[in-house]
Amino acid sequence: MPVLNLRSDFAEADALPEQMGAIGRRARAAARRMALASARTKDAALKLIAERIRASRDEILSENARDVAAARCAGQTAALIDRLTLDPGRLAAIADAVEKVGSLADPVGRQLAAIERPNGLLIERIAVPLGVVGVIFEARPNVTADAGALCLKAGNAAILRAGSDSHRSAMAIARAMSRGLADAGLPEDAIQLVPTRDRAAVGLMLAGLDGCVDVIVPRGGRGLVERVQAEARVPVFAHLDGINHVYVAAAADLDMARTVLLNSKMRRTSVCGAAETLLVDRACAATHLAPLVQALLDAGCAVRGDAATRAVDPRVTAASEEDWHTEYLDAIIAVRVVDGIEAAIEHIETYGSHHTDAIITENDAEATRFLAEVDSAIVTHNASTQFADGGEFGFGAEIGIATGRMHARGPVGVEQLTTFKYRVHGTGQIRP
């Protein structure tokens, strides 16, 4: 099938670079057609893709069972196997999520700005697709559908490279998506899955496939993201770590602080928006520190703290320098008492990852300062760090979270998968 790239130019290629180059060229050709697709056509395609995923349930679950069995034989962790595993409910949710993307507003063609010049020129800034998006992911087969759907909605073509653990599952989902694209009359090459486990394919994608890849989005662990950021010769939308902080200021309401802290840390400990460090203003430590630490411990969270924190509960263990740098993704948190907002901001600047940081305070001036000075993609006031999510932002879905400064920052949804062009309308003007 086309999604497998089993065409003559691919099947006869002797070398992986030639094979990957063929995928890139087909993606570029598909991207040109996708950029012109109407909103109605794209939405119809998403609905048809969702239907194809549902209709392919037995095939997808069978291939997923093979992936899971192989992962167990390879001794993979329970956490990875859980991320890898699909069941009828999870697969139905994947199909529903694809269909939901179709209900989002079309990001393409929006007028972002209009300028009328004194000489009569009308200049418009218009949203257009990025082009070809390369997505490299590991054990979550749902990324195949999520990333493909978001790229399609934004008028892009996608080249997807699944990890070895999820390869069979991803291929089965991609086959269903290819059928849905064909049903809608859109190019099947708009969503291609790299049909090899060879890791050299990743390097070729990072090199840009001879100019065919416009941006790379990695979805996976630190090792993958580090490699992508180090080797990519095209722009990258990614975050390396989620070392997120909750700062409880002197003017914080204790009940609110406790509720927000517990949600930030314990709602889901393994997500990138989970809090990893609690900072407490020394001015309120006498009233706030012990109750907050007790709440964490009672919720099953291990606490590693500085001397002031260890003094309030014997269950607290000593925090090392490494703890302030650590993204636990587990029921563990580091706690430090700081001398006011300036020290809190300095700590976040030194140890943070520019992902998501929160302040709990009833002092508006203090909140304003924190929101302005903390240099993170997402900064919250009296709200959980776990709102770091495209769905919670009203984006409908996200392809990831970016902490860089160029183009996309924070949740990367369909709007962030577009760029812009200028349209200049004249009546014969020439430049003097």
Swiss-Prot record:
Its EC number is 1.2.1.41. One of its GO terms (molecular function) is NADP binding. InterPro entries: Ald_DH/histidinol_DH, Ald_DH_C, Ald_DH_N, Aldehyde_DH_dom, G-glutamylP_reductase_CS, Glu-5-SA_DH, GPR_dom. It catalyses: L-glutamate 5-semialdehyde + phosphate + NADP(+) = L-glutamyl 5-phosphate + NADPH + H(+). Pathway: Amino-acid biosynthesis; L-proline biosynthesis; L-glutamate 5-semialdehyde from L-glutamate: step 2/2. The keyword Oxidoreductase applies. Keywords: Amino-acid biosynthesis, Cytoplasm, NADP, Oxidoreductase, Proline biosynthesis. Belongs to the gamma-glutamyl phosphate reductase family. Catalyzes the NADPH-dependent reduction of L-glutamate 5-phosphate into L-glutamate 5-semialdehyde and phosphate. The product spontaneously undergoes cyclization to form 1-pyrroline-5-carboxylate. This is Gamma-glutamyl phosphate reductase. It comes from Methylobacterium radiotolerans (strain ATCC 27329 / DSM 1819 / JCM 2831 / NBRC 15690 / NCIMB 10815 / 0-1). The lineage of its organism: Bacteria, Pseudomonadati, Pseudomonadota, Alphaproteobacteria, Hyphomicrobiales. The gene is proA.
